[in-house]
Amino acid sequence: MSQKFNAILLDLDGTLVNTLYSLQDTVNKALERFGFDPVTLEQTKKYVGIGSHKFVERSVEATANRLYREAEKWEEKDEDKAFDLDQQADEVMEQIDDVHDAYMEIFKENCIYKAEPYPGMRKSLDALKAKGWKVACITNKPMAEAVTVLNHAFGEGYFDYISGDDGTHPLKPDTGVVDDTLNHIGCKKEECIYVGDTNTDMETAKRAGIKSIGCLYGFRDKKELEEAGADVLIKSAEDIGKAIEYFEAE
């Protein structure tokens, strides 16, 4: 039986590589420079996925929201104190761009901190490459750091194409990145499968009209992936082959 598919497109953070610690460590170092609250690993999981600027914005917003909540508590007791807290929160939000600049500066050196491919990922991709499959990464991570992380985790030249945030195009879930990637690797939408761990990934695949695999081992939960329309869910990167067999049998 001939195979229906010949290309796999994968997200990076939470799908190919566990980068959670590098993301948290980097943003917390940036937040610390400005005296803002650090974020937890759980917050980091929720905040990432729509690009570095949005990640930083959400992380900064956590401090601002704490101040807004404190202001509400003081409204009846001390209006002046409540006003001051509101002002502080507003000032925090005004510094998002500055925090992002600091984040990007730190991230250049910190992007591979504790970053490792998920168990079974290399084996699964090697098996596909042995069958002649094209393997590409589509990420909202800054391009330079995406390449650095992938080279660190898989070796230089492992991927047929890498699409990252280079500031010249819309990010996922915009499907332009899918079209661009398929053009570069010479494959059609009906011949490829998309693998990711967030609602953004599933939405990208759905908009593009391609099959999707949702990764339960990544940064988001089953409920989010199901609601976002994942075609198949896997608990481990080792299960990618089984998911593809399911699609092949349809």
Positions of predicted regions on the chain:
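Acidic, Mg2+-coordinating phosphoryl-transfer loop and its flanking beta/alpha structural elements
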Residues: 193-232
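Substrate-recognition/cap helix-loop segment adjacent to the acidic, metal-dependent catalytic center
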Residues: 32-34, 55-64, 114, 122, ...
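An amphipathic alpha-helix signature
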Residues: 24, 28, 45, 49-61, ...
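Metal-dependent phosphoesterase signature
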Residues: 61-123
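Short acidic capping loops at alpha-helix termini that bridge into adjacent secondary structure
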Residues: 38-43, 157-161, 189-193
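Structural recognition of alpha->loop->beta junctions
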Residues: 154-162, 224-244
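Active-site neighborhood of HAD-like aspartate-dependent phosphohydrolases
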Residues: 1-46, 57-58
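Conserved Lys-Pro-Asp/Glu-containing loop-to-beta segment of HAD-superfamily phosphomonoesterases
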Residues: 7, 172-202
